[in-house]
Amino acid sequence: MRNIGIAGFGTVGQSFFTQINKNFKNFRVIQIAVKNVKKKRKINLKNIKVTSKVQELATNPNIQVLVECIGGSSGAAYKLVKTAIENKKHIITANKALLAIHGNELVKLAEKNNVSISYEAAIAGGIPIVKTVRENLKYNNISKIYGILNGTCNYILTKMEKEGKDFSLVLKDAQKLGFAELDPTFDIKGIDAAHKITLLSSLAFNVPIKFSSTYIEGVDKVELDDFRFAREFGYKIKLLGIAERKKDSYEQRVHPCLVKEDSEIAKVENELNAVVVIDDMIGKTVLIGPGAGGKPTGAAIVADLIDLNRGNINLPLGNSISNSKKLKNINILDSSFAYYLKIVVKDEVGVMRRISDILARNKISIDQQKQEHSNKRGYATIVIITHKIKEKIFSKAIKEINNMKRINNKVKFIRTEG
């Protein structure tokens, strides 16, 4: 019998509790921490101690497993988890922000106290990516792991493409349907996906967790006509989290990408998530499933609990943090991409030639291009797909183009991937 404490009793905490109560008799929830003890709940909590003092769970000697569903990278969640580990309690959490920011410290503490930190629910909800990488693929020399890691952004991009609605309208729809938070900043700015790819990068490459090294761009600058232009060139637009190893260095980044329309990742729509792992033994492994929501996330917590009950006290990162590799992090300026550019210019003779001269001078070659009249009278929209070029060179060229007098607003660009 495992005695469990649940910190936080929102959608995820309630879903986990319901699944445990219904299907597993060898687990017993003995204490739950909530914000409001007096709040009426549909779930029967008879014979369970309910408290508003969350730190009680960390020191309750009868609790062996703490399920943390509070959220947040610091404050109550951090103090609770740290104290619980010091009291030799196993941790199961859906809190990717906490681990991305404080993971190295907490993992080291967990190893010292011989307890586990399980976090399947923190990354891509219903996709068992942590277990897959840690137990099945880690020793296959993973060279790259990437995917759609935020269901809110994937839903927004899908609806913009399919229904022709602009970003702000789709975001409002997503909020009404519960696919986006009232404050969607962490989702639409790419921060949530960055937390997740940081953890996957550490797990896949055996490097310390380093969120500060993750390059981050969100989806809030993607415009409606970008989808049409991308489609004409054979692409779709997705927000991807990407971690890639190159010899003694690695990179981790989150940004919108143009992906080939016939690729697996391009076909993943709405709130679904997908993760692709590339290694030297199997090649490509693709996992697709629901990335968020009470039931998938609750099920992931249950899966971690079952694993723990079987005696699988896994090292959180697959290897001891003291044996992690010291790989150099690659700055995005030193990475190379093919780029999609959208430039709105005055519709005058010689403007395109000037842009071509700037690209040529910086040794940026054009793969595809088109030009059409802009919605703004007297202006034209030029769209270009380049061949691969290092970002620092590309950035220099874009700065030159932006300084042209006949440019309307700044150049918009999206990197291609794959």
Segment roles from a protein language model:
Residues 7, 305-418:
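A conserved regulatory-domain signal marking ACT and ACT-like small-molecule sensing domains
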Residues 13-14, 77:
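N-terminal Rossmann-fold NAD(P) dinucleotide-binding loop
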Residues 23-43:
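NAD(P)-binding Rossmann-fold cofactor-contacting core
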Residues 54-94:
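Rossmann-fold NAD(P) dinucleotide-binding segment
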Residues 169-267, 272-274, 293:
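Substrate-binding/catalytic subdomain of NAD(P)-dependent oxidoreductase enzymes
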Residues 75-76, 81-82, 96-125, 130-134:
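Rossmann-fold NAD(P)-binding glycine/threonine-rich loop
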